[in-house]
């Protein structure tokens, strides 16, 4: 339906409301689906008119449209069911269960069973989750609060919750104006016209000899001037505009450049009176990291407008309590992908987990499987999609702040969060550029593999840098940028010297498109006011000035052969356009059809093979043949795409990168692309046969079974994460032979002398009894320890000539740090026995706060000032383990000594959920932000997996213990997730094990034999390649995580003085550096902290043991804990 027809419905709704046709108003709201009357909906819910509630909702959404819709219908039907139970109307309750609630059983069978069991209770409030259910009135009110949040968050209700601002009786006014026009056209207008009907046009009868008065004196006509006839408002179309002036040719200036700017002209027909910008949509409980953007006004600040979705953000980012239900990924209203031509990439071949939301992507111009990615938190990643390996990951950092302008320094202090707006390769792939949302452009040189180096950093624009591109005017490689300061700038790519500044836009410049034709180099630019301008490299001003369809965010691109020009734009009210331009005439040649009525974000597009156009819209990828305006096909990528996904073809068009929800990138492939990726798999399997990684295979199975197809397996094999298996394409047969020779002489690396490694005992200004907890800060420049006497110790490395990075190192001692006030961070101990207390802490992502407890209240400390910000949750029960939610620092999982886990919201000071599944105190908690689960472990040696959407327990398993050891013997069991977020490490005094999460299956296990000392603690290295484990006899062992085989042993004599060699001093805790995979630290039972690194000449801890019998593991997948010496490598 056209926008004017839609507005006509609003006028009719206003008219009906003013005339008190109340039932008809709501019927039209429902049938048109244009306006959801929240007040009416609330009234019907409060009155319990459930049939009318669902009937009204059906005009806007269906049960299975998306997660929000399903949750809305579920809550309504659940309330209806509970009210029937409350009235003891069992037949009605059964009827509701069978007819209304049964549909949800396919999505959550356990929940449906639990609801069914309520029938067996005399009072459903006996169910713990419903124990606080009050009376019907209050329950409806509580439910309504949740329903409103869900409706506001639901993309299907976008633009439907706000009635347009209209003057009273707007429809009557328009009719009167129409009658005025009709009367003005009468040949013999009467002074007091008699309007008898609206069904036909008005016309005055003969004057009977009377002279008609002037229209100016006619009170009906007022002061309206005489005008020609106007065509009527069509039922489904806009007014026809008057003809535009003949447009100036876009290409005319190319053959004979002129310094005189052409007059501004229209790019085509202008729709009369387009719909106004909707009111800003509210985002309920949106996490702080959410990259969503409300509809901005025309003069709003342009920060990351190019890439952030308008209105409601992707479903995964909304902080609404959802049912743990998944849906098929079929895009709304699109047919399946079977109609797509074979040469379109339509098969999901890879799914990569980037870690933050992709905002821009670009394939290498030569290496067809090398993908560059920029994200909403300023990260850049370089992926080899063939092997699913992330070669490089870099976070945003200003290289030299002293050279930055004061506005930039002030902007970074005020708002340190920086997004990537665009990443792009140079034509030969030797450089790539990154444009950020704050002033900065960074250029890197690329030398193959993971070798990228800093090249240039340019403080390019005041405000955001919205686009970046490369061009070669006069055969000199240049970088073109544009920004919020309304300028386009050209920089020398070798030196960073500014060559040109183009000024003339009156709004922030959104995109640039350099090109050349007939030996003339030029640049197209688009701005947020919809203006398209063209520039020569001569500083003589813009050569053309056109209006882009949509008149807001527009990008331009040529076909691969440079002969056809296209643009893609999205207007402020969400209407999107892809058009082809006639360059010779400067006019739109064709407009492609098939966009959603209101795009849910700024649409991105790309071209391929000189034949196809593609755009990300409506949770899908839409394709057009360049020569036909009709939509060719739409592909949903097996579901899970963003509302307006970012897309990018590789140069051959065989692969298409598409951004999805939950920070993933899907790689779509055609038959050529699949063959290309298959060659990587063959090469990888051949070059890595001695190191087959069973865990990587299990990761794939885990991801699939969890409904995250390929999401977890994509993070590369555990064997290859440290660079050992990278660039497998370049592996020569001689390397395999060399490896075989080494395997014959491999032996365990023993470190027994201080000279065999770099170790350092940290200086001690304050003596403590023993170190109970230990962690490196996330920045990697400090270590935080919690002692058994509830005091925190902090050591910081200083940046100086000997330590240019300021990072932790075993080569230089740090300073034990305290604020000038001299205060200590000391936990509340209440009346607890220090020996019985279980100390625990958790550090925030930005290292600013630490949450800590030592048997008493939980304390929140400021890490800069050591001040206590808050204390809460006095015992009993006492906290025994703390973990921050990975997506929201305000949510904390707290393990308690009464065996429960409390999900606590710091902001509102409220326990949201209490999880029960263990029988003894909680000793470990770990979140997976890929699988959306929490894994817990306890002193009962039990492992539990909890869904973080509804906090239901998914499965549990008791850790197998050695024969002869009773399960009742208390011992801490700790858990830590692998980098792939699909596997986790289990640490018990009797064993190390790696488990697959979704099935809770043990994939690898290393057991402590009876003659050996127990394990005290263990942790993954930062890249999950290694496992560091400490033992009661003071040895520290380093294992390869791929197979849990021992590769290096650090004996006590290497770091403990001789005076302590016969004592009982040993490591209680061990911590890995967050960026250096071969650095770790231990906290000792005598209160000391030691940091370890291998010798610089070695660079790593020993050599991975060779494969046995063609396997990466010399042990069975899950040997018994009591395995004999022949089953286990010696320690």
Swiss-Prot record:
The modification Phosphoserine is found at residue 214. InterPro entries: CTLH_C, LisH, Topless_fam, Topless_Znf, TPL_SMU1_LisH-like, TPR1-like_2nd, WD40/YVTN_repeat-like_dom_sf, WD40_repeat_CS. The keyword Iron-sulfur does not apply. GO terms for cellular component: nucleus. GO terms for molecular function: identical protein binding; protein homodimerization activity. Residues 286-305, 1100-1131 are annotated as: Disordered. This is Protein TOPLESS. The lineage of its organism: Eukaryota, Viridiplantae, Streptophyta, Embryophyta, Tracheophyta. The gene is TPL.
């Amino acid at each position: 339906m056209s926008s004017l027809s839609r507005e006509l419905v609003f006028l009719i709704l206003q008219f009906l409301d003013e005339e008190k046709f109340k039932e008809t108003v709501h019927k039209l709201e429902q049938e048109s689906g244009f306006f959801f009357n929240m007040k009416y909906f609330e009234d019907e819910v409060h009155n319990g008119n459930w049939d009318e509630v669902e009937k009204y909702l059906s005009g806007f959404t269906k049960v299975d449209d998306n997660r929000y819709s399903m949750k809305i219908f579920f809550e309504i039907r659940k309330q209806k069911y509970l009210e029937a139970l409350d009235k003891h109307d069992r037949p009605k309750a059964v009827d509701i269960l069978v007819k209304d609630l049964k549909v949800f059983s396919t999505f959550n069978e356990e929940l449906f069973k639990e609801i069914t069991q309520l029938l067996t209770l005399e009072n459903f409030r006996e169910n713990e989750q419903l124990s606080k259910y009050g009376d019907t009135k209050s329950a409806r009110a509580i439910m309504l609060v949740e329903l409103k949040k869900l409706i506001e968050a639901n993309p299907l209700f976008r633009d439907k919750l706000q009635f347009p601002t209209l003057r009273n009786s707007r429809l009557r006014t328009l009719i009167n104006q129409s009658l005025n026009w009709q009367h003005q056209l009468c040949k013999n207008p009467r002074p007091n016209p008699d309007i008898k009907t609206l069904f036909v046009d008005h016309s005055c009868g003969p004057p009977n000899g009377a002279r008609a008065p002037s229209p100016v004196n006619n009170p009906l006509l007022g002061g309206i001037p005489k005008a020609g006839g106007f065509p009527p408002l069509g039922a489904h179309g806009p007014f026809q505009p008057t003809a535009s002036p003949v447009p100036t040719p876009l290409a005319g200036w190319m053959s004979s450049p002129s310094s005189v700017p052409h007059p501004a002209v229209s790019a085509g027909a202008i729709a009369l009176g387009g719909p106004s910008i909707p009111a800003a949509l509210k985002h309920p409980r949106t996490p702080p990291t959410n990259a969503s953007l409300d509809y901005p006004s025309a003069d709003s600040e342009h920060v990351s407008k190019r890439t952030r979705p308008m209105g409601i953000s992707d479903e995964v980012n909304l902080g609404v309590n959802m049912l743990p239900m998944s849906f098929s990924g079929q895009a709304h209203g699109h047919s399946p992908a079977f109609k797509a031509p074979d040469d379109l990439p339509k098969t999901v071949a890879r799914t990569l987990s980037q870690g933050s939301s992709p905002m821009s992507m670009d394939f290498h111009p030569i290496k067809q499987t090398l993908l560059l990615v920029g994200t909403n938190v300023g990260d850049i990643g370089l992926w080899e999609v063939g092997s699913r390996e992330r070669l490089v990951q870099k976070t945003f950092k200003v290289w030299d702040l002293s050279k930055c302008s004061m506005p930039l320094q002030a902007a970074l202090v005020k708002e340190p969060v920086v997004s990537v707006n665009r990443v792009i390769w140079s034509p030969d792939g030797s450089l790539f550029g990154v444009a950020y949302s704050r002033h900065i452009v960074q250029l890197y040189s690329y030398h193959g593999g993971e070798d990228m180096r800093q090249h240039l950093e340019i403080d390019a624009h005041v405000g955001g840098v919205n686009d970046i591109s490369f061009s070669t005017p006069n055969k000199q490689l240049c970088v073109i940028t544009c920004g919020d300061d309304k300028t386009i700038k050209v920089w020398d790519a070798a030196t960073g010297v500014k060559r040109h500044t183009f000024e003339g836009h009156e709004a922030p410049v959104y995109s640039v498109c350099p090109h050349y034709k007939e030996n003339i180099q030029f640049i197209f630019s688009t701005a947020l006011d919809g203006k398209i301008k063209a520039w020569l490299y001569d500083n003589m001003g813009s050569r053309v000035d056109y209006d882009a369809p949509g008149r807001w965010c527009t990008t331009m691109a040529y076909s691969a052969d440079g002969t056809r020009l296209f643009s893609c734009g999205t207007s402020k009210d969400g209407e999107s356009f892809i058009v082809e331009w006639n360059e010779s005439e400067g006019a739109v040649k064709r407009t492609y059809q098939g966009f959603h009525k209101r795009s849910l974000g700024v649409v991105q597009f790309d071209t391929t093979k000189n034949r196809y156009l593609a755009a990300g819209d409506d949770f899908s990828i839409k394709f057009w043949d360049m020569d036909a305006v009709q939509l060719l096909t739409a592909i949903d990528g097996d579901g899970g795409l963003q509302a307006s996904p970012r897309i990018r073809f590789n140069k051959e068009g065989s692969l298409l990168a598409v951004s999805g929800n939950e920070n993933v990138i899907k790689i779509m492939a055609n038959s050529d692309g699949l063959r290309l990726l298959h060659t990587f798999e063959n090469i990888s399997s051949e070059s890595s046969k001695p190191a087959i990684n069973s865990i990587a295979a299990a990761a794939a199975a885990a991801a699939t079974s969890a409904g995250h197809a390929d999401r977890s397996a994509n993070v590369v094999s555990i064997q290859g994460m440290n660079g050992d298996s990278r660039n497998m394409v370049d592996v020569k047969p001689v390397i395999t032979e060399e490896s075989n020779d080494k395997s014959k002489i491999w032996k365990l690396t023993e470190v027994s002398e201080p000279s065999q490694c770099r170790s350092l005992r940290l200086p001690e200004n304050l003596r403590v009894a023993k170190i109970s907890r230990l962690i490196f800060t996330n920045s990697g420049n400090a270590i935080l320890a919690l002692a058994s006497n509830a005091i925190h110790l902090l050591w910081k490395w200083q940046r100086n000539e000997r330590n240019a990075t300021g990072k932790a190192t075993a080569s230089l001692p740090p300073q034990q740090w305290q604020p000038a006030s001299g205060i200590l961070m000391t936990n509340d101990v209440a009346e607890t026995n220090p020996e019985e207390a279980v100390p625990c802490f958790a550090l925030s992502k930005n290292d600013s706060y630490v949450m800590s407890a030592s048997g008493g209240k939980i304390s929140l400390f400021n890490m800069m000032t050591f001040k206590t910000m808050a204390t809460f949750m006095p015992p009993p029960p006492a906290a025994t383990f703390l973990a921050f939610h990975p997506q929201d620092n305000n949510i904390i999982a707290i393990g308690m000594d009464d065996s429960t886990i409390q999900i606590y919201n710091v902001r509102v000071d409220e326990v949201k959920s209490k999880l029960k599944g263990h029988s003894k105190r909680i000793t470990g908690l770990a979140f997976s932000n890929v699988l959306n689960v929490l894994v817990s472990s306890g002193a009962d040696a039990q492992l539990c997996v909890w869904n973080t959407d509804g906090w239901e327990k998914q499965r549990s398993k008791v850790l197998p213990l050695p024969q002869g050891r009773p399960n009742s013997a208390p011992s801490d069991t700790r858990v830590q997730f692998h980098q792939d977020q699909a596997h986790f490490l289990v640490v018990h005094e009797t064993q190390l094990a790696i488990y697959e999460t979704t099935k809770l299956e043990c994939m690898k296990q290393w057991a402590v034999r009876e003659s050996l000392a127990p394990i005290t603690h263990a942790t993954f290295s930062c890249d999950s390649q290694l496992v560091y484990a400490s033992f009661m006899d003071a040895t520290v062992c380093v294992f390869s995580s791929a197979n849990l085989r021992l590769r290096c042993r650090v004996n006590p004599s290497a770091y403990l003085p001789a005076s302590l060699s016969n004592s009982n001093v040993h490591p209680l805790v061990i911590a890995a550096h967050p960026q250096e995979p071969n650095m770790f630290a231990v906290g000792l039972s005598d209160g000391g902290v030691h940091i370890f690194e291998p010798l610089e000449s070695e660079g790593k801890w020993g050599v991975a043991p060779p494969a046995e019998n063609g396997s990466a593991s010399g042990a069975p997948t899950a040997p018994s804990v009591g395995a004999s010496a022949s089953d286990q490598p010696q320690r």
